[in-house]
């Protein structure tokens, strides 16, 4: 337990909370360019080939973004929009790529939750 004089000389430091999405820098979304598009496997007990992309953002950060939905048209040099939101079974993936924005096409034949996947209303 410090003395009063010690506290006057060296006040207590407030612990800063760790940011969950530091690369966004307080923005809701950020734009970036895909540097690598690949698949990766999730942690136990799940099994799949999850589609992810390494993205270089406009602010210089390089992050890994998850590509949601079935099928995608992304390749290297595609311009994408990224939002926060981690994927629980993929370590290091703390961002989602937005579908139907910039170079990313929406999911085909999507009937429900279309706005999440950038799909137009079916006729």
Swiss-Prot record:
Segments for region (Disordered) = 9-32
Matching InterPro entries: NA-bd_OB-fold, Ribosomal_uS12, Ribosomal_uS12_bac
- Origin species: Bradyrhizobium sp. (strain ORS 278)
A GO molecular function for this record?
rRNA binding
List the Gene3D superfamilies: Nucleic acid-binding proteins (2.40.50.140)
Q: Does rRNA-binding appear among the keywords?
A: yes
Top-level taxonomic group = Bacteria
Could you tell me which residues carry 3-methylthioaspartic acid?
89
Per its UniProt record, what Pfam families does this chain match? Ribosom_S12_S23
Task: Report the protein name in the record.
Answer: Small ribosomal subunit protein uS12
- A biological process from GO: translation
Entry similarity comment: Belongs to the universal ribosomal protein uS12 family.
| PROSITE patterns reported in the protein's UniProt record | RIBOSOMAL_S12
Describe its partners and assembly state: Part of the 30S ribosomal subunit. Contacts proteins S8 and S17. May interact with IF1 in the 30S initiation complex.
């Amino acid at each position: 337990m410090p003395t009063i004089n010690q506290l006057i000389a060296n006040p207590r430091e407030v612990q800063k909370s760790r940011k969950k999405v530091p690369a966004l820098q307080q923005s809701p979304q950020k734009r970036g360019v895909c540097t690598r598009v690949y698949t990766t496997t999730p942690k136990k007990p799940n099994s799949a080939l999850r589609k992810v992309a390494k993205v270089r953002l406009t602010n210089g950060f390089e992050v890994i973004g998850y590509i949601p939905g079935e099928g995608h048209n992304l390749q290297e040099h595609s311009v994408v929009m990224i939002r926060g939101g981690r994927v629980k079974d993929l370590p290091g993936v703390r961002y989602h790529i937005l579908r139907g924005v910039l170079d990313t096409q929406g999911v085909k034949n999507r009937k429900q939750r279309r706005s999440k996947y950038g799909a137009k209303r079916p006729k």
